[in-house]
Amino acid sequence: MIGALARKFFGSANDRRVKGYQSRVNAINALEPELIKLSDEELKARTADFKKQLAEGKTLDDLLVPAFATVREAAKRTLGQRHFDVQLIGGMVLHEGDIAEMKTGEGKTLVATLAVYLNALAGKGVHVVTVNDYLARRDSGWMGQIYGFLGMTTGVIVHGLDDAERKTAYACDITYGTNNEYGFDYLRDNMKYRLEDMVQRPHFFAIVDEVDSILIDEARTPLIISGPLDDRSDFYNTIDGFLPKLDKTDYDVDEKQRTVTLTEAGMEKIETLLRDAGQLKGESLYDVENVSVVHHINQALRAHTLFTRDKDYIVRDDEVVIIDEFTGRMMPGRRYSEGLHQALEAKEHVQVQPENQTLASITFQNYFRMYEKLAGMTGTAATEADELFDIYKLEVVEIPTNLSVARLDEDDEVYRTQKEKYAAILAEIERANARLQPVLVGTASIEKSEVLAEFLKSNGYKQIDFGKENALDKLYAAARAGKPSKLFAVLNARFHEQEAYIVAEAGVPGAITIATNMAGRGTDIKLGGSLEMRVPKETAGIEDEAEKARKIEQIKADVERFREIVLKAEEIVEIEPAKGSKPAKTVTKPGGLYIIGSERHESRRIDNQLRGRSGRQGDPGRSKFFLSLEDDLMRIFGSDRLDSMLQRLGLQEGEAIIHPWINKALEKAQQKVEARNFDIRKNLLKFDNVQNDQRKVIFDQRVDLMKDDSVAETVTDMRHAFIDDLVAKHVPEHAYAEQWDVAGLKEELKRVLDLDLPVDDWAKEEGIADEELLNRIENRADEHMAAKVAQWGPDVMRYVEKTILLQTLDHLWREHLIMLDHLRQVIGLRGYGQRDPLQEYKTEAFNLFQEMSAHLREAVTAQLMRVEIVPPEQEAPVLPPMEAHKFDPNTGEDEMALASVTLGAPASDAAQRDPKNPASWGKIGRNEDCPCGSGKKYKHCHGRYA
C-alpha cells in the first residue's frame, strides 16, 4: 500500500532513471541544427576529432552528447531514419552497461548504433551479438552504412569463414556475429599454438541483441569443442532393442523433474535381457563392471520417454537435429552429451555417431562475463530482471514507447480437452479471415504446429508452398479483391530458411501464419506487408528500368492499400446482458495483427514475446490465448483443483471458461516454473564457476607461454619442482640415511629423467643431507639439458620446449575435463551423507587440478629429457615438425590432422625445400622421403616426432 502510494507520487525507480536522461537528450537535440549545416566530409571528420579528445584525456561519457548527435545525423543521411528521443535514452542505457527493454518495432537495431559508435571510438573493438547468421549479415550491412559514413570499419562473423577472414572481421572497429560463433572462436583461439594465429582481440564491449534468449534461455547449454572417441554404435542399437520389451510398470517417469528410473521389475527384466545378449558382466546389473551399461540403459529410457520427435528434435537427412526449446529453431552441429544423442539416433534408426571427448568448453554465462562491459537489448526482460542482475549484474531499464501501445490483450479461454481447444482456435481463425484480419498463431513445438496445420487442411485451407516462385501471389490477389484466401503459412524449424520472408508478410490482409516460438524474432511484422522484402524479390528478374519502376510503384500501392484494409479489420462483438439489466451493448475490438496463442509456455517472457509481435509503433492489434487442461503446463504444473473446479461448473463440450482469476492462476504456475528454472541455472553456474576459474588459469597460462620468446626458465622451474617432489617422496626431510628409499629414487630417476645416477653411492657418503642429494640430481639434469641445447642450438631447443609444453598442457587439460565431468555426475550423492555437494566438488576439483599440475611437470620434464633429433650426416641439427589440431565445433572432426607446424611460411613447391631449414619444408606426406636428405621415409625420420 505504502509502496504503491510512493510510486504514485514519486514514480518508480525505472521512471526516475529514465527522467534522469532527459537533460542529455535535450543537449543532443540542441546540437541538431548545428550538425545539419555540416558537409558529409565535416561530419565524418568528427570521428577523428573524438578520438583525438580521448587521447588527450577525455572519457567516453564526456563525448556521449556530441557522439550521439553525430550518429543521429549520419543515420538521417544514410538510412533516412532519425533516432527518436526514447531511442537516445536506449542508447545511453546500453552505454552504461545495462539492458534496454524496448517493445517490438521500437527500433532496437538502430538504437544499438549510438552506443556502438561511442564505444568503438576507444579502438578496442565492439561486438554486437545476434541470434542467427541472417540477422548478423543483415544488421552489419544495414547499420554498417552509418559506421562507414563516419569512417569506421564493420566486420561480420558467420559460419564457414576461415581464420584469416575471422581475424580481419575481429580487427574491425565493430563486429557483428552470433553468440555461438563468438564462443567457439574463443575456444578455438585457446587451442592455437601461436599468438598470430589467434583471431579475437581482448573482450572490451558487447551488446547482446535478444539478450534474454542468449543469457537466460541458452545459459544451460555449454559450447563444446570435441573429438570422437571409440565407436560403440552396435552397443547403443542392442540396448535400444530392449526398450520395446519393457512396459510402463518397468519404469517410473517424472515429467516435472525430467527423470526416469527403472522399477525392481524393470531391473530384473533388463538383467535377463542383458544376460541373454552376453552384455552383462558378473551377477548383477549394479556390479561395478556394469556402470557404463547402466548409464546407457538410463539414456535409452530418457530418449524413449522424455524426448519427443518434432518437439525436442527432428530427423533430417538421416541425422537427429536438436530443436531449441525456447526459439523452436534447429541447432545443427549441437549434440546432447553423455550418450543421449547416440540413444536418440538408435531410437530413430539412423546411423549412430561415435561419442565425443570434450576438448574445450564454456557456457555463455561465463563467456559473456569476460567482457569489460556488457549490455543487452530485448522486448521482454522485466520478468527475469532479478536473474539478469544476480548473475550478470545487468539492470533492466524499461524504455518508454515512442507511441503508446494500442493492442488489446484479452483474457485466456480455457477448455477441457485439446480437441475442443483446436476447434475453438479454428473458429476464431475463420472469423478473423472473413474480415481479412491477419492472424499469427503461436505454438510450443513443431509437432503442435503441424497438428494445427492438419486441422486447417481438413477444413478446406491450403498450405503455401514457399519452394515455389511467387508463392504469395494468390494471397495478394485475394487481398486486392477483398476476399479471404483460405491460405496459410507454417513457420517452424523445418522451414527456417524462409523465416524472414514468411514473418515479414504475416501482416498481409487475410494472412494466416502458424509459428513455433521462434516467431521470426528480429524481423518486424508490418501491417500490409513488407516493402523492403517484396521489392527485391519481385523485381529480381526485371531488367528494363521503366518496367521495374512501375512494378515498385504497384508494390507500394499494394502495401499502403493492404495496411488500410488491416487497420479496418475490426470486430464488433455484442455482449449478452445479465438478467434484468439494460439491453445488449456492442464492443468494437481492434483490427491490426491478431495474435492467437495455442498454449502457455513455461516462461511468461516467451508468451509476452508472442504478444509483442502485434501492436508495433502504435499500431492496433489483438492477442488471446486458447488453453486446455491437457496442455503440458496445465498438466504438469497446474493445480489439480482447476480441473475439479471446471467439472463443478458443469462445462459442456466446446464451452470455455474465461475469467481474470484463471489468468492469475496460470501466472502463478509460470512463476513457479520460472523460479525452479532460475534455481537450476544458478546452481549450474556455481558448479561451472569452479571449472571456469581453472579454465582462466590454463588459458591465461597458454597465452603467456605463447607470448614468451623462450620458455626455458619455465621448463627449468618445472624440472626442479618435479625433482624436489621426487626427492621429498623418497628422501623424507630429517630422516636418517638408512631410512631413505634409495632404490625407489634411482628407479624413478631412470624412468622419468632417463638418467642412471649413482644415487646409492651418494647416499653412502658420510654426512650427506637430502639437500645435497637434491642439488646433485638437479645439476646432472641441468647438464643433460644444456648438452641438448649445445647440440641442437638454442633456437631449435626453445621451439621444441614451447611446443612440447603447450601440447602436453592441452592433452592433460582435456583429460582433466573428463575427470571433472565424471566428478560432477556423482558428486550429488555426497548430499546423502549430509555433505554439501558444491563444497565437496570445489575441494575435489582443486585436488584434481593440483594433480594435473604435478603430472604436467613430470610429463614435460620426461619428454624433454628424452627427446632426440637425429641429424643427417654432416648436417646441422634440424627442427622436428609437430602436429597441430583444429577441431570443428559442429562435427568434432579434426580439420588439420597431420598438418605440420613449422617456424615459417610453408614452401609451395617441394623443390624449394632447404634440407637444412625445416621452415621451408611445408606439408609433408608421412610416406614421402624426408626432406633432410637422410634417404629414410619422413615417418621414420623427422616425422616420428609428430
From Swiss-Prot:
GO terms for cellular component: cell envelope Sec protein transport complex; cytoplasm; plasma membrane. Monomer and homodimer. Part of the essential Sec protein translocation apparatus which comprises SecA, SecYEG and auxiliary proteins SecDF-YajC and YidC. GO terms for biological process: intracellular protein transmembrane transport; protein import; protein targeting; protein transport by the Sec complex. Its cofactor is Zn(2+). The keyword Magnesium does not apply. Zn(2+) binds at residues 930, 932, 941-942. Part of the Sec protein translocase complex. Interacts with the SecYEG preprotein conducting channel. Has a central role in coupling the hydrolysis of ATP to the transfer of proteins into and across the cell membrane, serving both as a receptor for the preprotein-SecB complex and as an ATP-driven molecular motor driving the stepwise translocation of polypeptide chains across the membrane. It catalyses: ATP + H2O + cellular proteinSide 1 = ADP + phosphate + cellular proteinSide 2. InterPro entries: Helicase_ATP-bd (IPR014001), P-loop_NTPase (IPR027417), SEC_C_motif (IPR004027), SecA (IPR000185), SecA_CS (IPR020937), SecA_DEAD (IPR011115), SecA_motor_DEAD (IPR014018), SecA_preprotein_X-link_dom (IPR011130). SUPFAM superfamilies: Helical scaffold and wing domains of SecA, P-loop containing nucleoside triphosphate hydrolases, Pre-protein crosslinking domain of SecA. This is Protein translocase subunit SecA. GO terms for molecular function: ATP binding; metal ion binding; protein-exporting ATPase activity. It is a peripheral membrane protein. CDD domains: DEXDc_SecA, SF2_C_secA. Its EC number is 7.4.2.8. Belongs to the SecA family. ATP binds at residues 87, 105-109, 524. Its main location: membrane. Residues 905-926 are annotated as: Disordered. May bind 1 zinc ion per subunit. It is found in: Cell inner membrane; Cytoplasm.
